């Protein structure tokens, strides 16, 4: 994958527009989770150190295009950046017809989704973005799977279009895990439905040695193997699909599970052997023996890809499976990469972020890359690098 990298460019005195993913949760006008901002800070600091006039843009939420809405304003992000960098970071609302920024200065543009034509990737808007800068830097891996004005269109028209350090690191880590992984490789794919992760499961079945499934996905595989799943969430119409995947790659199944009679925070958890699951049971986690078996598989792996918690870890009585696997990944010497919103929440809960080799900032983009799909914002950077 050949793209021009921001780190290789001379940015002294250049006007640099950086597209970051600053789509963070905001509560009562204050940033509630700063993970994405923290991930973007090194790129912004580097551009300033290189003597650039820095303009940063991002989306936040899903406002009605062409209309300002206070709840989707990036004002809380500008406030956060000002504190984090110890300098004034002005939020600029009207920037499409030009903005004054000097070398060593930093401004944040208001939500790009307030601009008409952003989501449709309109050329007219993309050309206005491009006219603002000497160098466009795409650093938002989380939106790289969307062809929009500020992620794809601008890269077509900017004088120079490059990948930022965060985007480059994501691509390197994912390439390492998927293109030529150190073997044996284990993947953990969990979620409520096989249908939403079908492409991921198919793609991984051809590169990994062990495909560990969890959540509703595991229930469909259990049903495919003839095991009782009670009233658990599963997809009867995808049982044959599960059988086909299990014929291609080793899919270790739970030998014991944690069940309850209802899906609730107060539900009583009971450990049962898989054969003993009753008709009115709901499977809400893997059992302790299964967790130990899976942890053993992870211990002998050289590459681990993790997408999705294996139980309803938000309720502590159904969190042990995810906790044991999180610790096993943390203790492993393997190259490990984790991605997806729920996965990141589990990593936070069990305090293993420092032990995982690479944590992806992109949810949908992470999955699409794993599926083997082309990410439009990356493809345009490759095209520009060739030219």
From Swiss-Prot:
Give residues annotated as binding ATP. Answer: 197, 314, 340-343
UniProt-annotated binding residues for substrate = 21-23, 36, 59-62, 113, 146
Biological pathway:
Carbohydrate degradation; glycolysis; pyruvate from D-glyceraldehyde 3-phosphate: step 2/5
One BP annotation, GO: glycolytic process
- SUPFAM superfamilies xref list: Phosphoglycerate kinase
* Any one GO CC term of the record: cytosol
Q: Top enzyme class of this protein?
A: transferase
Task: Cite the EC number.
Answer: 2.7.2.3
Where in the cell does this protein reside? Cytoplasm
Question: Does this UniProt record's set of keywords contain Transcription regulation?
Answer: no
A Gene Ontology molecular function term for this protein is: phosphoglycerate kinase activity
Keyword terms, alphabetized: ATP-binding, Cytoplasm, Glycolysis, Kinase, Nucleotide-binding, Transferase
Paired cysteines (S-S): none
Classification via InterPro entries: Phosphoglycerate_kinase, Phosphoglycerate_kinase_CS, Phosphoglycerate_kinase_N, Phosphoglycerate_kinase_sf
Catalytically driven reaction(s)? (2R)-3-phosphoglycerate + ATP = (2R)-3-phospho-glyceroyl phosphate + ADP
Is Ribonucleoprotein given among the entry's keywords? Answer: no
Q: Which residues cross the membrane?
A: none
Q: How does it assemble?
A: Monomer.
Q: Which PANTHER family match?
A: PHOSPHOGLYCERATE KINASE, PHOSPHOGLYCERATE KINASE 1, CHLOROPLASTIC-RELATED
The Swiss-Prot or TrEMBL record describes its family as follows: Belongs to the phosphoglycerate kinase family.
**Protein name listed in UniProt:** Phosphoglycerate kinase
Q: What species is this protein from?
A: Pseudomonas putida (strain GB-1)
């Amino acid at each position: 994958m050949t793209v021009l990298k921001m780190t290789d460019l001379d940015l002294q005195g250049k006007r640099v527009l950086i597209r970051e993913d600053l789509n963070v949760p905001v509560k009562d006008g204050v940033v509630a989770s700063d993970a994405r901002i923290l991930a973007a800070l090194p790129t912004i600091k580097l551009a300033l150190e290189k003597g650039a006039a820095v303009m940063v843009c991002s989306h936040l939420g899903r406002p009605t295009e062409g209309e300002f809405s206070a709840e989707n304003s990036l004002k809380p992000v500008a406030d956060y950046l000002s504190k984090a960098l110890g300098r004034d970071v002005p939020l600029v609302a009207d920037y499409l017809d030009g903005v004054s920024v000097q070398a060593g200065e930093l401004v944040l543009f208001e939500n790009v989704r307030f601009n008409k034509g952003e989501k449709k990737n309109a050329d007219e808007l993309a050309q206005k973005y491009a006219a603002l800068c000497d160098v466009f830097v795409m650093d938002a891996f989380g939106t790289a799977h969307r062809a929009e004005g500020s992620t794809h269109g601008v890269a077509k028209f900017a004088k120079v279009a490059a990948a930022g350090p965060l985007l480059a690191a994501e691509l390197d880590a994912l390439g390492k895990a998927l293109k030529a992984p150190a073997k044996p490789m284990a993947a953990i794919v969990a979620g409520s439905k096989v249908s939403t992760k079908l492409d991921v499961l198919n793609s991984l079945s051809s590169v990994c040695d062990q495909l560990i499934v969890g959540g509703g996905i595991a229930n469909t595989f259990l049903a495919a193997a003839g095991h009782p799943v009670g009233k658990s969430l599963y997809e009867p119409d995808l049982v044959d699909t599960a059988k086909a995947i299990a014929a291609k790659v080793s899919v270790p199944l739970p030998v014991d599970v944690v069940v309850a009679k209802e899906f609730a925070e107060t539900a009583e958890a009971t450990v049962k052997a898989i054969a003993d699951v009753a008709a009115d049971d709901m499977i809400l986690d893997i059992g302790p023996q299964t967790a130990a078996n899976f942890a053993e598989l992870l211990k002998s792996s050289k590459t681990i890809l993790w997408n999705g918690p294996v139980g309803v870890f938000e309720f502590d009585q159904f969190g042990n499976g995810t906790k044991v696997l999180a610790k096993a990944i943390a203790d492993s010497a393997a190259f490990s990469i984790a991605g997806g919103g729920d996965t990141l929440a589990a990593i936070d809960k069990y305090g293993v972020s420092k032990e995982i080799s690479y944590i992806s900032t992109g949810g949908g983009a992470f999955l699409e890359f794993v599926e083997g799909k082309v990410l439009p914002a990356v493809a345009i950077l490759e095209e520009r690098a060739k030219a």
